[in-house]
Amino acid sequence: MDSETVLSVTDLGSCCRRLGWALGMTTAVVANAAEVSVAVAANFAAPMQAIAQAFEQDTGHKAVLAFGSSGSFYAQIMNGAPFQVLLAADATTPEQLEKAALAVPGSRFTYATGRLVLWSKQAAGVDANGAVLRAGSFRKLAVANPKLAPYGAAAYETLQSLGLLQSLRGRLVEGQNIGQAYQFVASGNAELGLLALSQVYVEGRLSQGSGWIVPAHLHRPITQAAVLLKAGRDQPAALALLAYLKGAKALSVMRAYGYEP
């Protein structure tokens, strides 16, 4: 046997110790990893999926995501749904849950401010000033249910500010959440939609189609708040996720999708 390949008893013991230490570290990471159940407003689906992936890579914790309207999640949580963290599309829902003793006091914070966009999947469907709304050259305009989804409320406020709500009311088609409103437009069931900018915006530009970013003064600010729910109290993964949302990586993702952190 070549002398260069011979391991002494001392060398072998040292290798085993190093291997045991490495395995121990791996076991420790796995042992400390946990899951967090997160209720996510539909408008935040795409950025949250990216954030959750980075969160798992960086911490070992896994975020199990459910998407829907803030109003629907409020009802589910009030009825005992075991979510640990809520990322709402408004500030009111987390505040109401805190008042109902279903959220941890002091854990609520604004994680993003959303923007509304008038969008068409057609390249020339929407002009730069949104004049297509006044022209009326469309059959259906998709919006989210304003009673359940803050982006739906912002859509109605925008139409009201433009003096178009009454004239366009018969053309509105409502989705239960902003995700369903997007599907109406993407499937061709509605030519236009007042949607969350994040649904059609990536890396500083529209991913497809055409759109008009609605001026912020036409509706109340879409302030989106996160809160630690009662089921997440003292849960390491839940606490880690809320901290992660305030970090540079998460904020960078939000900006790429058109949010104002």
What are these regions (language model features)?
Residues 16-17, 190:
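Residue-level micro-sites within transmembrane alpha helices that shape
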Residues 1-15:
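N-terminal secretory signal peptides that target proteins for export/translocation
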Residues 2-5, 25-26, 32:
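Generic short amphipathic/hydrophobic targeting helices enriched at N-termini
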Residues 33-81, 88-91, 95-261:
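Exported/periplasmic ABC-transporter solute-binding proteins
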Residues 11, 17-29:
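Bacterial N-terminal signal peptides
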Residues 7-10, 30-31, 214:
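N-terminal non-cleavable signal-anchor helices
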